[in-house]
């Protein structure tokens, strides 16, 4: 008998249908020589500290660092999990072959490997590796099963990540809680969570410390066209351009003379310039026309989809992940937890059928039918695809979708259709003029051939039912603005003006901009190619970033004001307490992330990684224990009191349907509970669930989602 193990019951049912297994049993489906069973996500987890050494049960500075000589796994304590595991164990003990049908990624590999290890599986194991759950994809996957040994590096990377997070999280959280916490409040520290919080705190401090500088902009109106004075670049701007050119030569700006007037920093200078030119004719000195092309926007990876949904619909990263996961399980989009925007060459022959299946978008797909589809290197590139390709539709018609799912599917579908359309062709016109040797510039843009832009063009009279127009706002900012026909040498009267301006502080992070910052380890990058290069050193993985942001909300380290993410006093104080750069540096944490990726690629040793992490934790413990100051972090209760006091000055009216993030500030922060007050309290480990009472121990209501909190009676 061949045993197939999937990550959830719904996927198991899809696989069983394809394999012809029809007989439903307790915990599995049988038939045609197969037994298809399932997990509920994580069934196993790493052991708790006290399960290695009993003295580690109590939180004590003297027991730190806690580093077991050998890590072990255990079954999560829950009757439902225990029952399902016994079923899996029985099936595997009698199996001739096992097919690992877990989620095709690092976490999915770890989940199933732990279950097989715990069950004592000893027969050959194959791996099903698919990017969608359609019948066609499952059949193709079973025709190309791989040996599980090929995925050993993937497992080692996942195991290293889990152990690394355990070592750092368990030790640093206890260390900072006991050293700097008050009133039993837990100060949660994490390998990804803390640097992410530090990014938000740093941005907030930059805003608070920002001093606005007044300046003036000189412009003039000539033939109903506004020309702005050309401002000479500062040495800092020139140095930044040079640095950017070295990092990304393809996008280097063409070298030009540093022309123009110095920035106008006082009113008198500006008024003098106005007086100087107001009675002098304006003369056109240069008219330059240039044609260019604009490629379609890239296909989505998970992060870019989360960014787009946050910008357009204000969906949180977590909401978007759940929506695209649901679309994947409904078989209308491909595997979502990906970090590439490219497709492999083997997808190209399938694209015509996928387009044909997008029946709500016939108005856009009909012009492509029967034609040879464009195959751009910006879309199809095997070297940019590893485990999975970009998120695309499967070709199955999107039916029975919620309104939120329709919006997300619409984004994915339009991006996919657009990559097979021609580039947008446009012409830009740059006009330079001068008055008394002061140069002014105006630019215009004209769309010659919209190409792929018709997919997003307005008015959207052919929107699929229930679909919105996701790019209306973006299109308005991209609207073409033509200039009148200017001729070099022409001259005439003009009307100068002087506008007062102030320099602006950095903007607070939103979930969209924070996701981008996590992706590039804190570097502000707008260019796709440079962003790709920095992804290797990003903070966290695409599939975990949403959970990290949610954790910061649950820990009361950040809150949301409209779309802006604001650090709470507790979050600010915690980051201020941490002197160890390895704990809060986005760049250094990105290097750790890169090493985990290299383990997956077999170019870095997992043992070396863990030894380095253990050494780092030991150094952090020594450093914190050597701190002789009496610093403490303000408790949530104190923070709430202070906020309430200051908030009485001016309270804006709350709108109906206030964001859950704002409402969540009323929930208690995690604390170190005593045994007699555990049940119903917030889980001290994940902060999401509440403590429940089992047969032999207390646990967390979020155990199905991976929380491993357990406290024996």
What do these predicted ranges mean?
Residues 1, 99-104, 183-186, 289-298, ...:
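Conserved short loop/turn motifs at secondary-structure junctions
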Residues 247-298, 306:
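Metal- or metallocofactor-binding catalytic centers and their adjacent structured scaffolds
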